[in-house]
Amino acid sequence: MRMNYFVVGTNDMETSVKFYGALFEHSGLTQVRPSERMTYWLRDDFAFAAALPFDGEKATNGNGTMVGFSVGSAEEVTRLYKTALELGGTCEGEPSQRGPRFSAYVRDPDRNKLCFAD
């Protein structure tokens, strides 16, 4: 079994598309098939999406829920961390060595928690 895709909820699709579009710009993920309710970014082996909730209720971030991205290097961790903050994300943990991995933590504008690790 392997991870196929991950979807984060949003209450503002325009802000999410701007945030993730810029964040993923150099990552190999390509934006495809945007609709009024959901926008996907794809790579050969993975998909990520931002979506307005199907039930029409307000999107909320999960307490204890986090999306982790393996990005290949400490430099890329730091670049993505800084980019996320420039795009309106907030810091949840500055780039540093944590155990065997160099990582950083941010929240997107909807407060979904993301981790970037080398």
Task: Please provide the spans of the model-predicted regions.
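Absolute protein N-terminus
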Residues: 1-3, 118
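Short secondary-structure boundary/capping segments
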Residues: 40, 56-59
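Conserved, structured core segments of small domains
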Residues: 48-54
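Residue-level marker for the onset of beta-strands and adjacent loop->beta junctions
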Residues: 4, 35-37, 91, 102
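Core segments of cupin and vicinal oxygen chelate
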Residues: 7-48
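Vicinal oxygen chelate
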Residues: 3-11, 27, 59-118
